[in-house]
Amino acid sequence: MASLCFRTSVVFALVAAGLALWMTATHDYRALHAEVVLFVLGWGSFMAYGLYYRTIAAAAAGLVKFHYVVALIGVIVEAVGIMGTEWGNPFFDPFRIIGAFIVAVGFVLFAIIVFATRETAAHR
């Protein structure tokens, strides 16, 4: 699972960097907030998840796959919602809100994984 998190992190970084280049070339910065979500929540969070799952082998069971799917969906839905909203389309506003909620659920799942596996990993 750690390797999948690392690869996902790299994909988010590449997409965010592509958005940054596009914004710079066009002088159109409406995608800025979506780019930040992709860098911070996509690249940063998935890199942290991967590092944790690689370091704490006991965390590789249980909720980890579910957490990955929830976190992935949350980042994508929030970024798409932010971009659509910033481009003036109110249709995307619920996606931004729902995506942020899903991201928060992903963080709660990660916290549960961390606190549930901490004792197990410490006693190996």
Describe each region flagged by the PLM.
Residues 1-124:
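Hydrophobic alpha-helical transmembrane segments of multi-pass integral membrane proteins
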